[in-house]
Every structure is written in C-alpha cells, then in structure tokens.
C-alpha cells in the first residue's frame, strides 16, 4: 500500500522524532565525554540516528517514495545498536538501560507506523 503524500504528522510520528532525538543526544554526549579512542562509535551512532531521522521526517518529495525503506533502516539501526550494547562488556549502567528502553520503544513505534502507512 502506498503512502499518501499528504499524510499527517501525528502523535506516533512525533513519538518517533522525540525518541530518536533523545537516543541521538545520549550517544552524542557519551561520545563527547569519552576519550576519542573509545568515544567515536558513540558519535557515529548519534550521526546515524540524526541522518535517518531527517530522512524519515523531512517532507522532501524526492525522498517520499523511500520513506518505508528509511523506516526499516531506522528499525535495523536501533536493533543493531541494542544488540551491540548487549554484546559489550561493562556497559550496564542506568543510562544504558534507559537508552535501550528508548530504542526498543522506538522500534515498536516505527513498526506501528509502518503498519498504518
């Protein structure tokens, strides 16, 4: 089913924007507060979230036909981030658990958004 180009940006989409922004900010701040040798993956993760969020949220006609692909890329990106965190040793902090809760909720909202598209 194709999405309408006049689709409204509702609460579900705003939830996706807010959760993606929060997790991007968390990763950005972790990257800044960590030595560069270990902080760069956090900075790259933040950049990836922001890039995918912009591709998802901006109403650019050329990108509109790829919105479903971007949604699935964002789901995969969040899932890989959760799995990478789970595989890392020593990353079990309250902030880490909070961020993973955000990312799992983000995956759910993106999936719901895809079902309603």
What role is predicted for each listed range?
Residues 1-117:
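Membrane-interface extramembranous regions
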């Amino acid at each position: 089913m194709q999405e309408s180009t006049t689709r409204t940006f509702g609460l579900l989409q705003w939830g996706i924007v807010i959760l993606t922004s929060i997790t991007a900010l968390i990763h950005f701040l972790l990257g800044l507060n960590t030595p560069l040798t270990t902080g760069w993956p956090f900075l790259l993760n933040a950049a990836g979230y922001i890039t995918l969020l912009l591709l998802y949220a901006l109403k650019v006609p050329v990108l509109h036909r790829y919105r479903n692909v971007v949604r699935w890329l964002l789901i995969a990106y969040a899932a890989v981030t959760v799995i990478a965190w789970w595989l890392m040793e020593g990353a079990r902090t309250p902030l880490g658990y909070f961020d993973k809760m955000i990312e799992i909720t983000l995956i759910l909202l993106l999936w719901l958004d895809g079902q309603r598209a």
